[in-house]
């Protein structure tokens, strides 16, 4: 144990005042008690800290009261992780400063953000080459900003909800369509500042603190003693996953916090890695006679993703295309669905391409050849190069979940307890066809209406079950659980990008087992002795 790189040493800091709103002061602030899951929570107090020091003060006060603490920011999550079960709701929405920029010796640019900074703000500022907060930056950051202006960089993680906050995306290891090429949030996080429930602060730099080969690591207590523990021993799924604490040999301890969903500590600041952006972007929509040909096309694209600059592969199945045609018939041009949607297509695949400008014609030619070779309809492909054209295709893609939501909203007028049942599951490459066949067989046998769409490049398809009545809803929920077990049996994850939150805690146990849950809770107790942080998230209350 002479090597202390596996010991984390949080420090006490001078705390700043952070008023807690209670009683009548909470009236009119009900929106903070819910997120996009539509679940409504309760809170004894609400705080809006403006600094790490204020966060430390707020959690110290909550701990003295014995209150649980729930973290919130943009409230874009759909698994109810930001929905409080009493106690203190800690909103980080005022932690909105981009604090600086630095360039490492190897030329990498790292952007220093507070947790409440929105993804949209980061991406827009990078496109503009300027940051509103730069007037307060130090000389090193200003020099790096001047160098940045000669580059074309971006931050790759792209969850569907672009108004998500940086801290929230890190807390659930967010991913999106472009995860196919660039991966999820985790590899782009270089440094974190984290407030623990005792008010002390951890600074975590990637590569600075690694667990031992057997998973052993420690955290220094306030009295100087070391509390020892082990990282989880379960195998991480061979797919994208946002289910539970990360596990890997000699785990970099920063990775415990990425994807921990606000249950180990409160992320207040982060340094995120920027990478070169493609010179030009293009969106392509391809149409297919049947699902088998669409799957063959997907497999071929996987083999050539780097060569062709394929950033995303998204699927829309036959049922979903039929739903979009009905939307077009009902709403016309306002539907966002083009009138030229092929009437006979049995599936569609959308691609995002990022490449060098002078390479784009050749890339599009190779794609057309590939579509023809696999049996698609090259003459019906849609290609969008200009920003406004790509935006129209984006609107078309988002018309599908909007249509699903409108159908559920209509059903809820008669059956208000019904909600959408949408899966968030991924399997390894070799099992894509298998899981699709299982989905269709089980859904047909249950006589449930559904559509399938999503990130086919990562074998991460969303099955959206559309229950017509309470009986359908129960059958759909039972199938949802059955699908989760099947996906785990195939080596996949039942929570690929949205996290576990408070809604899918049983799926986490399906994935890691009883022993895995015990190992995770042991890790949690090292950082949160009284288990007050994120109560009900990951682990059932």
PLM regions and their residue ranges:
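Alpha-helix capping/hinge segments and adjacent helical runs
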Residues: 490-500, 529-533
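A glycine- and small-aliphatic-rich helix-loop capping segment at beta-alpha/alpha-beta transitions
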Residues: 83-96, 127-131, 176-186, 273-276, ...
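General beta-strand structural signal in soluble alpha/beta enzymes
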Residues: 20-25, 47-49, 68-73, 80, ...
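Activity-critical C-terminal alpha-helical subdomain
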Residues: 505-541
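FAD-binding subdomain of flavoenzyme oxidoreductases
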Residues: 99-101, 115, 119-120, 124-128, ...
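N-terminal flexible segment immediately upstream of the FAD-binding catalytic core
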Residues: 1-64, 76-110, 119, 124-134, ...
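C-terminal substrate-recognition/cap domain of FAD-linked oxidoreductases
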Residues: 26, 30, 258-477, 486, ...
